[in-house]
């Protein structure tokens, strides 16, 4: 073990040198603080990774030295080769290698390797193996651990361990204060998961000095959003009012005359367009709301959070001098929408008063009514109402229960054998309650004579499963089936909406909302591909074969017949629409197209966003 440890140290420094390539990608730009941090982060990260590998290899000490050296040389050489290949993948795609990338490459559908490529790979493997074996041979047979050399090894270990601690502590502080130059480093290092803890930081931040460090012209972002500067309303057209009404965890099958009668009637009376096959951009609030306000996949969340990049939809509203009212039942800072979507809004309403979800929902309704009645009516208005009762299965205790039998929710006892009916009835009751609150909003829009000049978007951030797939899934953030991703989606707002009815039975996504509103109601003249990967709902949707969805730790490419999931470890699963594994080859062309959408805003050049991407 004593002689194996110097071998590990040498490999740590070799990997650190290879990792420099991650930071040399075109257009990469780093603040000096990020450059210093990246040194500690890379060294500390590989120190922990190789220590883990060393522990795994400990049983090899029982083998003969020759056999042990061959196995170690193979393992460590493949580790270094994998790292080098990852630098190539990262340079081209701006994300790290994973199983789905490997499957796509070796499927033969997307990439064809020449004989020269295979020969070069073989040469690389041979050279790497020989180098590792030579290092092992030297360490075992030639290296004499004198007192001086032992001291060097000890100091190296102390330095590497200190780098590990420093990088994690610094990242925790940077994350708390939203210091993007430091946070941006994370995306460059493979499998790097630096420490974050708001609780620890808030303990030291006794004076409440936490703030968002937002730089309007962040040159360190390495995110090209938009692709070109926006040309906004050059003809000075009169913009319309816009209101987003979003219910957390709203199932598509609970928009009905029975469960949400007020909304159902309001939509019918005002010729609203109801979309039958609409999906969120995720199965969790973070990515669902992100896609709704940005018009791009939720996979960009981490990069946009690290760099505090606001929604172009919101900044366009601000440039057009809109009244903006953000009313969320739950905290707008969890997830960190105050550091992403709404980062440019001053005096942002962070939270409602403490209380149950249903009481907070009533509070945001009352707050919105008070704000809306006293707004500056000479200016256009945007408002966002985000209700939480369905997410919590909550309604006031004195409510008249409409859906029976009704049961209490206890996540500890939920399993595949639990009867969903009482729980589903509780959920329906919570939707029914929020619908009663929304009648006040609808009445005010009519009473104030502003409805004719208002675009109303009604939807959910994601859906809510009641063990629909009979696999023990309850709630959301668990899979990408319809039960967790399909949501109601309705647009109300004037005769011109007749033009979008042709898409109401087609596959649509939260990504389509921003480009539709930006183009037709905020009069942005740019190509949609400058700022979104979504579709214009006023134009006929053709050849949409897949949707990209994500959550906190995975993403999925969903088609009309299957789901291709990639988890946080990069391991892929090919499943049917009910989340059961299938032994079939997925359509790697679709996966390739989806990956191009995932990297599109990480590339300075503007490539095509058609179904045949380069």
Q: Residue spans of the language-model regions?
A:
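Stable alpha-helical elements in mature extracytoplasmic
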Residues: 259-263, 309-313, 360, 364-368, ...
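Active-site-proximal alpha/beta segments of enzymes that process anionic O-linked groups
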Residues: 159-411, 521, 534
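A short beta-strand-to-alpha-helix junction
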Residues: 304-309, 421-434, 479-485, 498-515, ...
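Generic structural signal for small/hydrophobic residues in well-ordered secondary structure
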Residues: 43, 248-250, 292, 317, ...
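Histidine-centered active-site microenvironments of extracellular/periplasmic hydrolases
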Residues: 446, 450-495, 545
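A long, amphipathic alpha-helix that forms part
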Residues: 191, 366-373, 408-454
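Transmembrane and membrane-interface helices of multi-pass
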Residues: 1-189
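Membrane-interface soluble catalytic domains
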Residues: 5-9, 64, 136-140, 151-157, ...
């Amino acid at each position: 073990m004593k002689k194996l440890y110097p071998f590990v140290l040498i490999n740590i420094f070799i990997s650190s040198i290879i990792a420099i390539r991650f930071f040399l990608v075109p257009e990469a730009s780093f603040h000096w603080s990020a450059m210093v941090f990246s040194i500690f982060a890379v060294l500390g990260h590989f120190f922990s990774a190789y220590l883990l590998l060393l522990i795994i290899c400990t049983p090899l000490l029982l083998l003969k030295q020759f056999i042990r050296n061959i196995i170690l040389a193979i393992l460590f050489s493949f580790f270094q080769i994998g790292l080098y290949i990852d630098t190539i993948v990262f340079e081209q795609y701006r994300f790290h290698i994973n199983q789905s990338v490997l499957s796509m490459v070796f499927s033969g559908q997307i990439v064809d390797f020449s004989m020269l490529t295979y020969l070069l790979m073989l040469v690389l493997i041979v050279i790497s193996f020989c180098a590792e074996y030579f290092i092992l041979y030297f360490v075992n047979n030639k290296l004499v651990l004198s007192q001086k050399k032992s001291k060097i090894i000890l100091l190296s270990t102390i330095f590497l361990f200190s780098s590990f601690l420093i990088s994690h502590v610094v990242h925790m502080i940077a994350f708390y204060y939203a210091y993007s130059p430091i946070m941006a480093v994370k995306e460059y290092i493979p499998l790097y998961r630096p420490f974050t803890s708001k609780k620890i930081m808030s303990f030291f931040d006794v004076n409440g000095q936490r703030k968002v460090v937002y730089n309007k012209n962040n040159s360190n972002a390495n995110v090209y959003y938009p692709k070109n500067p926006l040309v906004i309303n050059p003809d000075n057209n009169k913009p319309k009012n816009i209101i987003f009404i979003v219910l957390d965890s709203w199932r598509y099958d609970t928009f009905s005359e029975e469960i949400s009668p007020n909304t159902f009637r309001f939509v019918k009376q005002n010729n609203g367009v109801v979309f039958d096959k609409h999906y969120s951009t995720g199965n969790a609030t973070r990515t669902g709301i992100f896609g709704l306000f940005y018009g791009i996949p939720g996979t960009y969340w981490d990069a946009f959070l690290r760099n505090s990049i606001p929604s172009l939809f919101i900044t366009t509203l601000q440039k057009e001098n809109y009244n903006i009212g953000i009313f969320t039942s739950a905290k707008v800072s969890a997830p960190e929408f105050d550091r992403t979507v709404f980062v440019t809004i001053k005096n942002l309403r962070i939270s409602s008063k403490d209380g149950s979800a249903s009481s907070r929902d009533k509070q945001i309704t009352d707050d919105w009514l008070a704000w809306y009645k006293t707004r500056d009516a000479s200016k256009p208005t945007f408002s966002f109402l985000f209700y939480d009762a369905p997410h919590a299965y909550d309604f006031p205790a004195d409510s008249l229960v409409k859906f029976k039998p009704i049961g209490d929710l206890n996540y500890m006892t939920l399993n595949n054998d639990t009867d969903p009916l009482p729980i589903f009835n509780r959920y329906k009751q919570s939707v029914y309650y929020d619908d009663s609150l929304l009648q006040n909003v609808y009445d005010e829009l009519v009473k104030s004579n502003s409805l004719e000049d208002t675009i109303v978007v009604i939807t959910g951030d994601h859906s809510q499963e009641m063990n629909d797939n009979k696999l023990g899934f309850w709630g959301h953030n668990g899979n990408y089936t319809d039960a967790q991703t399909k949501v109601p989606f309705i647009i109300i707002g004037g005769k011109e909406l007749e033009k979008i009815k042709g898409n109401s039975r087609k596959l649509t996504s939260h990504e389509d909302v921003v480009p539709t509103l930006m183009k037709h109601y905020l009069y942005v003249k740019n190509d949609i591909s400058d700022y979104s990967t979504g579709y214009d709902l006023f134009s006929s949707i053709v050849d949409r074969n897949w949707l990209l969805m994500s959550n906190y730790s995975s993403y999925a490419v969903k088609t009309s017949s299957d789901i291709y999931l990639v988890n946080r470890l990069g391991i892929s699963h090919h499943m049917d629409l009910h989340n059961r594994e299938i032994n079939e080859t997925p359509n790697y062309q679709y996966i390739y197209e989806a990956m191009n959408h995932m990297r599109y805003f990480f590339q300075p050049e503007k490539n095509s966003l058609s179904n045949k991407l380069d």
